[in-house]
Design a protein with these regions (language model features):
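Contiguous, often N-terminal, cationic amphipathic patches that form binding interfaces
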Residues: 1-35, 39-42, 51-53, 57-72
Length: 72
C-alpha cells in the first residue's frame, strides 16, 4: 500500500498522525541533512505499522517534505 506522507523534521516529538484526506503526518526529531530524516522516517513507520524497515521504501520525494511511501 502507498501513503502520501507529510514530514515535519526537527520536531520535539516523534509521532505519526492520520490526516482526514488519508495521508500521514509524521513528526521527526532528525534534521533533513544527509538523509537522516528519511532514515528516521522509515524507522518510525516500521514501528508504527509493525513492519521490518526493509518492507518500507520512499517511492518519491526523497528531498522534499511531501513523500510517497510504499509499505509491503
Amino acid at each position: 500500500m502507498k501513503f502520501t506522507v507529510h514530514v515535519k523534521p526537527n520536531s520535539r516529538k516523534k509521532a505519526v498522525e492520520m490526516c482526514e484526506d488519508g495521508s500521514l503526518r509524521v513528526y521527526l526529531s532528525a534534521p533533513p541533512i544527509e538523509g537522516r530524516a528519511n532514515e528516521q522516517l522509515i524507522e518510525v513507520l516500521a514501528t508504527h505499522f509493525g513492519k521490518a524497515k526493509r518492507e518500507i521504501s520512499i517511492v518519491a520525494g526523497r528531498k522534499r517534505k511531501m513523500k510517497i511511501v510504499e509499505i509491503v
